[in-house]
Amino acid sequence: MTTSARPPLAISRTFPLAAADAWDLLADPRHHPRWIPLTRVEVQGSPLAVGWRVVATSGPFARRGAPGVRDRMRLDFVEPPTTSSQGVAVFTKLGPLLLGTAEVRVAPRGDRASIVTWVEDVYLAGPLPPALTRRVLAPVLAGMVRLALWRAAREVASGHEEHPNEG
């Protein structure tokens, strides 16, 4: 679903969850602040529906409501997994700083496991060539994605996964 000549960053991890459960947990950005440091997420619209708006704000005091780097996104494609096919959610980054796409892919691996792949094809808005800023951002994004997937897996292993609509 990406348009760059360079392959996007894609990191996968196996989860001991059925694909539907992994999808509910990882495709929903309202969970992401638990795994991504210094980040808060605000949403507008119906969860995991095309057109859903998400703003992730990152910075030293972002979780306390302070300003930070805003990553505005719109969900442009959503297809949940089935017992036999991969699910995909594609978020288009709308600026003002970050452009491109982020995807969450969840593929079933039997009844009780799934492979989650988080894809980032992100570059900076502005005068510099997207190919250059993709390369600059790649190590930071790779670290963020690896950490988020590791923390999510640790949460699942501990049996403490939370849901946004629960108290």
What does each model-identified segment do?
Residues 8, 108, 114, 163-164:
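Extended beta-strand/beta-hairpin segments
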Residues 91-147:
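Beta-strand/loop substructures that line and gate deep hydrophobic ligand-binding cavities in soluble
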Residues 17, 60-62, 122-126:
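Beta-strand elements of well-folded, non-transmembrane domains
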Residues 33, 43-101, 150-167:
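Glycine-rich portal/gate segments that line the openings of hydrophobic small-molecule binding cavities
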Residues 24-31, 37, 142, 146, ...:
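Short, intrinsically disordered, mixed-charge
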Residues 1-50:
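Hydrophobic ligand-binding cavity/cleft-lining segments
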